[in-house]
Amino acid sequence: MGLVHALLPFAAAAALLLLAAPPPATADDPGLAVYWGRHKEEGSLREACDTGRYTTVIITFYNAFGHGRYSLDISGHPLAAVGADIKHCQSRGITVLLSIGGQGGAYSLPTNASAADVADNLWNAYLGGHRAGVARPFGDDAAVDGIDFFIDQGGADHYDDLARRLDGYNKYYRGRVGVLLTATTRCSYPDHRLEKALATGVFARIHVRMFGDEQCTMSPRYSWEKWAAAFPGSKVYIGLVASPEQDSAWMFQKDLYYEMLQFVRSLPNYGGLAIYDRYFDKKANYTGEG
């Protein structure tokens, strides 16, 4: 049973609007984000966007950086096809982000200069920049809408420098945000790896992972509300696993509504749900209506 379908007896039309807001989303719509790129069997990026479920897809992961080497790992998906799919998703009003970091990989920012180099590579390889000698893995005419910081290992140094530099590229866009910055944090507040970066105030969204942390399993609503209170200027999302196969913190749809959504959805900076990940959402139909 899908997430929307399961909530209808309890929240009727309100839950439908909350969890199944179809793209394109306005600034005031609750969002439904999904992480894509961890399993080749999850289907293409285009397929995910064509479900009509998601307002944002987050490509995972740009997972090697900071030492003069840059690498993308999207589990064997063909890069050329992803570029075409990015443009297709954007044509449907769906935001496409590239997540940096993740579990595993080889990344850190040992110096301010390394942060500058990573910002330059992200800008010219994946965002709106172009520079001779810098390859664009998704093609010359495909650009993601922003960068998600999913920093799950190493130290905290210089991610604030990276965030400021990426935000600085918005000067090249007139009247709009060309480089959207988001962060995927651990549930316990604060997340020490991202604390300094978030203090810059340049992150439009924060996706709080309500899994992988015993404290959050015990008191998920309280843990999430600490984040919402700390960052009133950012949209704060509830990060969920789509299947009990992934983590014991998986929340049955009814429990999600009664334990969290009925209380937090009225908060002005509630952003929506962030589902990890597309493979398990497709397999379990967690956000579907069937």
Curated annotation (Swiss-Prot):
What the entry lists under Pfam families is as follows: Glyco_hydro_18
Q: Name one GO cellular component term.
A: extracellular region
Q: Which UniProt keywords apply?
A: Disulfide bond, Glycoprotein, Plant defense, Secreted, Signal
Relate the induction remark in this record: Induced by wounding and methyl jasmonate in roots.
- Disulphide bonds annotated for this chain are 49-89, 187-216
Question: A GO BP term, please?
Answer: defense response to fungus
Q: Name one GO molecular function term.
A: enzyme inhibitor activity
Show the InterPro entries listed in the entry: Cts1-like (IPR045321), Glyco_hydro18_cat (IPR001223), Glycoside_hydrolase_SF (IPR017853), Glycosyl_Hydrlase18_Chitinase (IPR050542)
Which residues are in the GH18 domain?
30-290
Localisation per UniProt entry? Secreted
Q: Does the keyword Cell wall biogenesis/degradation apply?
A: no
Alphabetical list of CDD domains matching this protein: GH18_hevamine_XipI_class_III
Q: Sugar-bearing residues?
A: 112, 285
Instruction: State how it assembles.
Output: Binds to fungal GH10 xylanases.
Looking up PANTHER family in the UniProt record yields: ENDOCHITINASE, XYLANASE INHIBITOR PROTEIN 1
- Cited function: Fungal xylanase inhibitor. Possesses competitive inhibiting activity against several fungal endo-1,4-beta-D-xylanases belonging to glycoside hydrolase family 10 (GH10) and family 11 (GH11). May function in plant defense against secreted fungal pathogen xylanases. Is similar to class III chitinases, but does not exhibit chitinase activity.
Q: What is this protein called?
A: Xylanase inhibitor protein 2
Gene source species: Oryza sativa subsp. japonica
